[in-house]
Amino acid sequence: MKNPRVHEIATAMIDAVRKVLVDHQ
């Protein structure tokens, strides 16, 4: 089950979460 789109969205979500966590530190 290799869907590049899903991987792309997951990476973007992780990136956004990391940004928020870093901003709140």
UniProtKB/Swiss-Prot annotation:
Catalytic function, reaction form: 3,5-dichlorocatechol + O2 = (2E,4E)-2,4-dichloromuconate + 2 H(+)
Pathway it works in: Xenobiotic degradation; 2-(2,4-dichlorophenoxy)propanoate degradation
GO molecular function: dioxygenase activity; metal ion binding
Induction of its expression: By chemostress caused by the herbicide 2,4-dichlorophenoxypropionic acid (2,4-DCPP) and its metabolites.
GO biological process: catabolic process
EC top class, as a word: oxidoreductase
EC annotation from Swiss-Prot or TrEMBL: 1.13.11.-
Annotated cofactor note: Binds 1 Fe(3+) ion per subunit.
Lineage: Bacteria, Pseudomonadati, Pseudomonadota, Betaproteobacteria, Burkholderiales
Full protein name: Chlorocatechol 1,2-dioxygenase 2
UniProt keyword list: Aromatic hydrocarbons catabolism, Dioxygenase, Iron, Metal-binding, Oxidoreductase
Species assigned in the record: Delftia acidovorans (Pseudomonas acidovorans)
Annotated family: Belongs to the intradiol ring-cleavage dioxygenase family.
Cofactors: Fe(3+)
Bilayer-spanning residue ranges: none
